[in-house]
Amino acid sequence: MFGIHSLAGVLLLVIVQSQLASPLQEAEDNSSLETADSLLEDLRGVPNMKRQSEGTFSNYYSKYQEERMARDFLHWLMNSKRSGAPSKRHADGTYTSDVSTYLQDQAAKDFVSWLKSGPARRESAEESMNGPMSRRHVDGSFTSDVNKVLDSLAAKEYLLWVMTSKTSGKSNKRQEDH
């Protein structure tokens, strides 16, 4: 308890002394306030200069990085040329790939055109070499012959059905009419 009372007394003493000293310092503070304001304005201008200098530094640093990257690239190019090892460029690989794709497409087109027009040429070439040969199913002769036979059978059955149904239908109608 005694410690708290002594602490409160010391604080009261400090406050009273500061209150008595403040009227004396007011006269001195007016002149110091003017200098403090001018110092604050000067300090406010400093961060702008720092920002500008930071921007200048960043600009110079990025230019330095670009120059360094260009220099490193040139050194790499010169070293790769000096090594004498055959190097495959990306453009060469792309060209080779494009040519391969084109040739594959062209081969596919040639094969399809050969399939479309090939049997007649192949048949005449085979006949001249080996004599007459029977046509294969791939050539389409068997399929077309079977289709012709089936069409003629279907036509005969249809005609037979029509003839039988008309005669029975006519006779029924005639019987109903009479």
Curated annotation (Swiss-Prot):
Induction: Produced in the A cells of the islets of Langerhans in response to a drop in blood sugar concentration. Residues 1-21 form the signal peptide. One of its GO terms (cellular component) is extracellular region. One of its GO terms (molecular function) is glucagon receptor binding. Its main location: secreted. Promotes hydrolysis of glycogen and lipids, and raises the blood sugar level. The keyword Hydrolase does not apply. The keyword Signal applies. Residues 83-87, 123-134, 171-178 form a propeptide. One of its GO terms (biological process) is response to starvation. It is found in: Secreted. InterPro entries: Glucagon (IPR015550), Glucagon_GIP_secretin_VIP (IPR000532), Ppantetheine_attach_site (IPR006162). Belongs to the glucagon family. This is Glucagon-2. Keywords: Cleavage on pair of basic residues, Hormone, Secreted, Signal.
